[in-house]
A protein has these predicted regions:
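Short, solvent-exposed amphipathic alpha-helical segments in soluble enzyme
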Residues: 46-51, 129-133
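C-terminal folded domains that constitute the principal catalytic or ligand-binding module
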Residues: 112, 121-220
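Short microdomains enriched in Cys/His and/or Lys/Arg
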Residues: 19-47
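S-adenosyl-L-methionine/SAH cofactor-binding core of RNA-modifying enzymes
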Residues: 54-128
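Cys/His-rich short segments
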Residues: 1-27
Length: 220
């Protein structure tokens, strides 16, 4: 017997995620390159990103070297690849110069954030295969954010690793000057999640926590 599906999210009605989607205007457009294995992953977070952000596009594949649509986007935007590579620049807290810093090379092109969605191994493979990504400006999150993941429902490569939604919200909040930190530790070596406020993106992160608990409820 066919299961009843929720029309908007295309999931069984018992697993509908629509209540965790909240419309959020992002000044910086988001492009997600998603590994094919993530498309039907019920615990994935890109569906929440795509449903919530007003400017979000998803391309599915593994080797994007000759992807015409992606190459057109790369040619028309100043692209920041969120990827913790050897040459990545760390996005700064309370630095409203972030956007200016990364748009100096070509002010005529709008800024765009690009995120790879997949396990660490699959994201690495996507990056290595996609030669057109290698020349992009790479950015990464500061450690106090990168190590503050609340992704409880999937096995991750390291403790407190971030989901695609968390990483994206943190990056957008940093780029757009939305993050506020309340802690006595000025070094920011350790910051508790409750001390991080991502402004415009905080409701999405709050709903992400609820999404985690919702998924955990199916484990009985």
């Amino acid at each position: 017997m066919a299961r009843n599906l929720c029309t908007p999210c295309q999931r069984p009605t018992s697993a509908c995620i629509c209540s965790f989607i909240i419309e959020t205007h992002n000044k910086t457009p988001l492009l997600v390159l998603q590994h094919p294995s993530e498309v039907k992953q019920s615990k994935g977070t890109v569906a929440l990103l795509n449903g919530s952000l007003t400017s979000c596009k998803i391309l599915v594949g593994e080797d994007f070297t000759h992807n015409v649509e992606l190459n057109e986007i790369l040619a028309s935007h100043q692209v920041l690849l969120l990827y913790p590579g050897e040459h990545s620049q760390i996005l700064s807290l309370h630095d409203k110069k972030n956007e200016g810093k990364f748009t100096q090379t070509d002010k005529a092109k709008p800024l765009l954030l690009l995120v790879l969605d997949g396990t660490w191994k699959k994201s690495y493979r996507m990056f290595m295969l996609s030669k057109n990504l290698h020349s992009l400006t790479q950015v990464c999150l500061p450690d106090y954010l990168a190590n503050n993941g609340q992704y409880l429902i999937r096995k991750v490569a390291k403790k407190n690793a971030l989901s695609s939604l968390e990483a994206t919200c943190y990056a957008l909040a940093l780029l757009e000057g939305e993050i506020k930190i309340t802690t006595a530790d000025k070094s920011l070596k350790t910051v508790e999640p409750d001390n991080i406020d991502c402004g415009n993106y905080q409701p999405m992160l709050n709903n992400f926590i609820k999404f985690n608990h919702f998924q955990l409820s199916f484990r009985g």
